[in-house]
């Protein structure tokens, strides 16, 4: 499967792969608090400081589960791949933003054709939300994925029931 944007105007795409992972493959990882830049911008937008803006992640600085290599086989036209498992806990809000990939660009020496692929590891649950380029998404199935170009605004939240995290795999890569 290749990641393709139908035209130069397309900013994102959606697709599906059949899940080949189990809950144990990602739920038992040693997730840590994800700290990322951007808080001042969100405070300036009027979001109060008590909001939880970040969930938990398990990234490339840790040993990756064995099944992760299959994603590079499935998405055959990407390179410089990094993986981050993300656990968005209940009452986490990630306001609309653009990822600048500063560290990724530095590490891989690239500036263009950077994409994000978000693989939904579980079926959608009420209160889970994703927005890409001003379009909202709910009701996804495990294996659904969303890919977008690096300059595309996106947002996410988990305002669902307590103890009902949203698990995703974030793939950052260069489109070949």
Give the role of each language-model region.
Residues 80-81, 96-116:
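A short beta-loop-beta micro-motif enriched in histidine and acidic residues
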Residues 90-92, 143:
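Tight coil/turn sites that cap or link beta-strands
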Residues 87-89, 106-126, 172:
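Short, conserved beta-strand element in jelly-roll/cupin
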Residues 1-85:
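Non-heme Fe(II)/2-oxoglutarate
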Residues 6, 88-89, 133:
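A structural detector for beta-sheet-dominated domains
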Residues 11, 113-115, 163-167:
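Residues at beta-strand starts and edge strands
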